[in-house]
Design a protein with these regions (language model features):
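N-terminal leader/targeting segments
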Residues: 1-98, 102, 508-509, 629-630
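Membrane-interface helix/helix-cap signal primarily in integral membrane proteins
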Residues: 2-17, 80-256, 601-634
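Hydrophobic alpha-helical segments of integral membrane proteins
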Residues: 7-18, 205-220, 229, 237, ...
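Membrane-embedded alpha-helical segments of integral membrane proteins
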Residues: 18-63, 360-363, 457-509
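Hydrophobic alpha-helical transmembrane segments in multi-pass membrane proteins
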Residues: 25, 41, 63-76, 190, ...
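Divalent metal-coordination and catalytic microenvironments
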Residues: 33, 109, 161, 233, ...
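Non-globular, low-confidence helical/coil segments that flank catalytic cores
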Residues: 108, 131, 146-160, 180, ...
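Hydrophobic alpha-helical segments of membrane proteins
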Residues: 224, 229, 317, 402-418, ...
Length: 634
């Protein structure tokens, strides 16, 4: 009994350490409520909402009876608020449209968004009087291979397209894209075959400047491959980077340099902030009477806002802009600036405005990376390290970059595996030269060139930046082509990701070593569950058009997967580089009727796996073992 009392006392003291983090845990509980609503069915939502309300009512009653349940009430209210905000988003989102195959259609549409890539242009459109009535209930995301410069956001276009509704994943059990697409209003995808501009609205000054900037950089550098990197860093448009080069940048673990995120924004803001501080210091009448930092913050925020508009307001840059603004606001008000407070307030404000953003990979990875950096910086492990004995600046620099890469990798690797089914470990090495070249050479020089855009000095600065950008391309080309530079990972289940991230959040945020150890155990359990997940033996889509089976550690396709995109997605989800065509020697046999697969049978050891149609013409997986059939519907 004495030992138990001591343990209870230790736990009580440890939990008291979390009182200073109560606001952070409350915000995370709000986010948990959003996720609980998005990833449960209609019946489960009613059960969760009712149970939460009952527990909240009981907690209030106990609190009235002088029982200390204040913290429990706060958490329940936060969870319920997050749950209800997500429920409202679901309620106001159109229901899933009727499923149909690819259809040819001609109709007018209004351009809502344009995203340029190294291949096709991705257009987000809203249909105007379409022949398929359900298309009026949401947005269309279509690929266009023509010239995107002839129209802009707000233009009305007439398109001829092959279109299909967004389906529940192109891979068995993978519903992540449809969950993301539905709450962002995307109900159909397809390809534009013909496009005619009906009404071209006048482009804004920002759009015109962005297009002129891109063409000027491209021509000033003689269309060098480094020009694409410069354009991506300044405008967020990676369409000027060749596809092979873009793949190498991703496989080398350096794709983050192309995303306008907090690192880019902080370099630009710090650059402008320091310049204006030195300018104001030249005037003693100002420097001696006023706080020049407050004056310098005004142009820094203005430049940050301009950079955000030129970059077309990506999520990661928007998050960084809010954090920068809040930091300078604290400077104006003479308040202490705590980075964790700023991060969580930004996190909460973005979720309150758009709870569906929590489903965005960019949102998840951006916040988790910054969260990891701040937590590591605030930890005793970092603060207690004595760096002074290390006299070599090179060693300290390499160690700092390597430590930053490890922290960023640990924070985001599981999101990378979940969304992209791969992990570029080589990034731990390639980032050592790439990050300083990008942030302290290419970005500042390019930014000054942008300020002098249209002049000979601007063109000269673009050429200088292009020289170093080409060095970055050479580094990424070399590291990406090393043996096993990036590793493919099989599909991770949503619940496995949730367990791992919950454990990491506890490790990063908690002050109590008890909660830290508990979070570490939870994260390890989730990781072990993922590693030990059995490989699927038989995989198929809803109409049995594509059937893939496992034999000898390799996957074989019954019929060739005609779509390169579909082949890539299936291979990624299965964690392999390719799916091989089935040869005549394989043991999988398929029954056919009028050249259509109606069932397949695969023998492995004493078991027989088979796929066939049910009475309702829907595919059913049947597993046979010891003479007993067990149906498992897809």
């Amino acid at each position: 009994m004495v030992a138990l009392k001591k343990v209870a006392e230790i736990l009580k003291n440890q939990l008291k350490c979390e009182e200073t983090n109560l606001r952070f845990w409350t915000i995370l509980t709000f986010a948990a409520g959003i996720l609980a609503c998005f990833f449960t069915g209609q019946t489960a939502r009613m059960i969760v909402a009712t149970s939460t309300c009952i527990v909240l009512l009981l907690a209030v009653i106990f609190h009235i009876l002088n029982r200390n349940t204040k913290i429990l009430i706060v958490f329940l209210v936060a969870f319920l608020c997050g749950f209800l905000s997500a429920a409202w988003k679901i309620y106001t989102t159109p229901d899933e449209p009727t499923k149909y195959g690819a259809r040819e259609a001609i109709f007018d549409a209004k351009v809502r968004d344009i995203r340029l890539t190294s291949g096709d242009t991705i257009l987000t459109l809203s249909a105007i009087n379409p022949p398929i009535l359900s298309l009026k209930n949401g947005l269309l995301k279509l690929k266009y291979s023509g010239n995107p410069m002839e129209f802009s956001v707000g233009s009305t276009v007439k398109i001829k397209t092959s279109i299909r509704t967004v389906s529940y994943g192109v891979f068995l059990g993978d519903k992540s894209y449809e969950n993301y697409a539905r709450f962002f209003g995307i109900i159909a995808r397809g390809n534009i075959k013909e496009l005619e501009v009906v009404d071209s609205t006048s482009q804004s000054f920002t759009d015109n400047f962005r297009k002129h900037l891109q063409s000027r950089i491209y021509e000033a550098t003689n269309r060098s491959r480094g020009a694409g990197v410069i354009i991506a860093i300044l405008t967020g448009n990676n369409s000027f980077i060749p596809q092979e080069q873009l793949d190498n940048i991703r496989h080398s673990g350096c794709a983050h340099i192309l995303a306008i995120s907090g690192l880019h924004m902080s370099v630009i803001v710090s650059f402008v902030f320091m310049i204006f501080i030195h300018i104001f210091s030249l005037f003693p009448s100002i420097a001696l009477r006023y706080n020049t930092k407050k004056f310098a913050a005004i142009p820094a925020i203005a430049v940050c806002l301009i950079y955000l508009q030129i970059a077309n307001v990506p999520i990661s840059a928007f998050r960084s802009f809010i954090m920068v603004t809040l930091g300078f606001l604290a400077l104006f008000l003479n308040r202490a600036r705590t980075t964790m407070n700023v991060l969580f307030f930004t996190f909460l404000s973005m979720l309150v405005l758009s709870p569906e953003r929590i489903l965005s990979p960019s949102f998840q990875m951006s916040f988790m990376a910054v969260f990891g950096f701040i937590s590591a910086y605030n930890s005793r492990l970092v603060n207690n390290v004595n760096w002074h004995p290390i006299k070599s600046r090179t060693v300290r620099y390499v160690g700092g970059i390597l430590a930053s890469s490890i922290i960023a990798t640990l924070s985001t690797v599981f999101f990378e595996i979940y969304h992209f089914k791969q992990y570029a470990w080589i990034g731990l090495i390639s980032n050592i030269p790439v990050i300083p070249l990008t942030e302290f050479v290419v970005l500042p020089i390019s930014f000054v060139g942008m300020l002098c855009n249209g002049t000979a000095l601007g063109d000269l600065l673009y050429c200088v930046a292009d020289f170093f950008a080409c060095i970055i391309c050479q580094i990424t080309d070399y590291t990406a082509n090393l043996h096993n530079a990036y590793l493919l990972a099989p599909q991770m289940q949503t619940w496995q990701l949730g367990i791992i991230i919950a454990g990491l959040v506890a490790v990063f945020l908690a002050r109590s070593w008890v909660i830290k150890i508990g979070g570490m155990i939870i994260a390890v359990c989730g990781l072990i569950s993922y590693i030990n997940s059995p490989k699927p033996v038989l995989v198929y889509n809803q109409n049995l058009k594509n059937v893939v089976f496992l034999e000898g550690g390799k996957y074989y396709s019954v019929e060739p997967i005609k779509s390169d995109y579909l082949h890539k997605i299936w291979a990624q989800n299965l964690g392999v580089r390719e799916i091989l065509p089935m040869s005549d020697s394989k043991v999988l046999s398929c029954q056919r009727a009028r050249d259509r697969i109606i069932g397949c049978e695969y023998k492995i050891a004493d078991n027989v796996y088979s796929i066939k149609y049910s009475n309702k013409k829907k595919p059913v997986a049947v597993y046979f073992n010891g003479g007993r059939f067990v149906e498992r519907k897809d």
